[in-house]
């Protein structure tokens, strides 16, 4: 938690001034019952209207000063809380960006979204309340007791007994409920995860007529959340009635003692009113304190969850400078896998086993295999989205781990299976590949990606708006734009991870022809389910259950690799295959 407090840096002044101004407000509030007692004891008893008006003016002055102090404290506490949450959110987002795919897979997208939004907001609200009330409420409680002694020491002993009892109730409820709020947040994560999963896959749910099944899953998770929230709510709800009972008993005792003191001349009636007002002030502040404790319990639980993400160490480190030298016998290599294995965190079986091959500069490498054979896992190792658990992966004669992050990403461009575009324009999305690219560079990339025609047909061309996720574009258009985005950076290695699946055969063929015609020694990896898309590749890697079962040209594999032959024949008629 000490690290969490570090995000208050720059707001130390506000963090001190906010509670101080609340204490000033409380100080003026503590004088109000004494002024009211004077009005009753002196003004009303003596029928002195002038005295009453003067004291009423004093009450208005105290109220005005208290309001000014309160507004000032609100301003400083809000500024500190918002500044803190902004710094925390920035730090959390930056830390998430530093995590590898492995940590992202472990934590989960919905969990990280919850940490960034709901949890940080809860911490902000808790801090805001804390700065305003953590000194004011105890100060008023203790101050009211001290002021009660200035009125009547015997009656004030009731405060001495009542306040510890109230403290036991308040802090007892806090101790019991705080760990339960952590459970509530965990179950809330589960509900949010199910919601996100369902909304993301809503078309699949409806296609398989699983609406009722999903409703049942959600209701089960929601019932667990509701049950825990009710349990915590019932425990927290005990606080108010218990405190009210104790306060009311204390007021009854005050009235009893006060009546006796008045009869013997030890107190005036105004003094009893002052003592009751002090007791009511204690009640109000303890209710505030109780609510503060509930909010702080939630905020601490959320802060702990945010801290857990911040404590997650990135599984990968990148050097600041390029390391090592290229061996003379590897100068022509673009990518080299040497007995590579990969096992994902938490997975029971390896996804890749003993993979070895070399891709030369300028070659086109096809990757094919059945579903779950490890195709994406293999190409994900090249840009170092994951680290191999066995063996070594090299690009251009050096281990991928020897490249700084920006240098590696500059040389290797990858187009993912799912075409992901961001809200903005076509131009802004393409500039992700190279922020300094000219319009000529953008159009050249679009021509190669077979996207220039449909972009020219748009009313605004490169400045045509793109909705979040590319919702206003077809699947094929999105895929071609993501390919163009990768080409804008002019990489040395281009990886197309089944990223032309939405293209027709003619467009797919034109794309491959355009890639082959690019100047320079661009090495291309094409992951595809279509054997036809890989026929002209210099090498084709055939994967089966994480093993490399075949490597060679299309013609060689048809005669030497049963898995490849089976895939090919399943996509073409027997006569066409033989032709």
Please report, for each region that a protein language model flagged, where it lies by residue.
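Short intracellular "coupling" helices and adjacent cytoplasmic loop segments at the cytosolic face
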Residues: 46-47, 82, 90-114, 118-120, ...
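Membrane-integrated ABC transporters
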Residues: 1-31, 36, 44-60, 65, ...
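Hydrophobic alpha-helical transmembrane bundles that constitute the permease/transmembrane domains
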Residues: 19, 23-31, 64-71, 123-126, ...
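Helix-loop-helix
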Residues: 48-50, 54, 147-161, 231-305, ...
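ABC-type nucleotide-binding domain
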Residues: 327-579
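An intracellular "coupling" helix at the cytosolic face of ABC transporter transmembrane type-1 domains
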Residues: 10-13, 98-102, 118-131, 135, ...
């Amino acid at each position: 938690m000490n690290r969490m407090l570090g995000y208050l840096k720059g707001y130390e002044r506000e963090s001190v001034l906010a509670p101080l101004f609340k204490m000033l407000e409380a100080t003026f509030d503590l004088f109000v019952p004494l002024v009211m007692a004077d009005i009753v004891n002196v003004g009303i008893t003596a029928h002195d209207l002038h005295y009453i008006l003067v004291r009423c003016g004093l009450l208005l002055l105290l109220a005005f000063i208290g309001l000014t102090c309160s507004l000032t404290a609100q301003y400083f506490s809000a500024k500190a809380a918002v500044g803190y949450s902004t710094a925390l959110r920035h730090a959390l987002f930056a830390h998430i960006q530093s995590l590898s795919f492995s940590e992202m897979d472990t934590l989960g997208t919905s969990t990280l979204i919850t940490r960034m939004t709901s949890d940080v907001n809860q911490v902000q609200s808790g801090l805001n309340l804390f700065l305003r009330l953590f000194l004011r409420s105890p100060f008023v409680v203790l101050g009211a007791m001290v002021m009660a002694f200035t009125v009547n020491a015997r009656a004030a002993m009731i405060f001495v007994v009542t306040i510890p009892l109230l403290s036991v109730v308040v802090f007892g409820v806090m101790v019991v409920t705080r760990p339960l709020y952590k459970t509530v947040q965990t179950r809330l994560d589960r509900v949010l995860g199910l919601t996100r999963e369902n909304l993301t896959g809503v078309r699949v749910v409806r296609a398989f007529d699983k609406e009722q099944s999903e409703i049942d899953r959600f209701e089960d998770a929601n019932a667990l959340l509701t049950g825990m929230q009710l349990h915590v709510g019932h425990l927290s709800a005990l606080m108010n009635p218990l405190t009210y009972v104790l306060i009311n008993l204390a007021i009854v005792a005050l009235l009893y003692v006060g009546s006796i003191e008045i009869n013997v001349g030890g107190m005036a009636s105004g003094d009893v009113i002052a003592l009751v007002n002090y007791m009511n002030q204690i009640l109000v502040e303890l209710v505030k304190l109780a609510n503060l404790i509930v909010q702080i319990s939630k905020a601490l639980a959320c802060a702990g969850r945010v801290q857990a993400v911040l404590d997650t160490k990135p599984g990968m480190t990148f050097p600041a400078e390029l390391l090592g030298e290229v061996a003379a016998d590897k100068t022509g290599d673009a990518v080299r896998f040497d007995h590579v294995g990969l096992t994902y965190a938490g997975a029971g079986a390896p996804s890749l086993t003993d993979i070895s091959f070399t891709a030369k500069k300028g070659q086109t490498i096809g990757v094919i295999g059945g579903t779950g054979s490890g195709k994406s896992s293999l190409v994900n190792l090249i840009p170092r989205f994951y680290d191999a658990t066995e063996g070594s992966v090299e690009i251009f004669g050096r281990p991928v781990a020897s490249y700084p992050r920006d240098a590696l990403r500059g040389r290797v461009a990858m187009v993912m299976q799912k075409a992901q575009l961001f809200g903005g324009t076509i131009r802004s999305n393409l500039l992700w590949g190279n922020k300094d690219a000219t319009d000529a560079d953008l159009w050249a990339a679009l021509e190669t990606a077979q996207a220039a025609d449909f972009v020219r047909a748009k009313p605004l061309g490169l400045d045509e708006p793109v909705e979040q996720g590319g919702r206003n574009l077809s699947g094929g258009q999105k895929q071609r734009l993501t390919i163009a985005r990768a080409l804008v950076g002019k990489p040395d290695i281009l990886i197309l991870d089944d990223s032309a699946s939405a293209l027709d055969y003619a467009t797919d063929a034109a794309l491959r022809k355009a890639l082959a015609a690019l100047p320079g020694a661009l090495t291309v990896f094409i992951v595809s389910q279509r054997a036809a898309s890989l026929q002209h590749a210099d090498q084709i890697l055939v994967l089966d259950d994480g093993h490399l079962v075949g490597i060679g040209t299309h013609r060689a594999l048809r005669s030497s690799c049963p898995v490849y032959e089976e895939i090919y024949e399943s996509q073409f008629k027997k006569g066409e295959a033989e032709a």
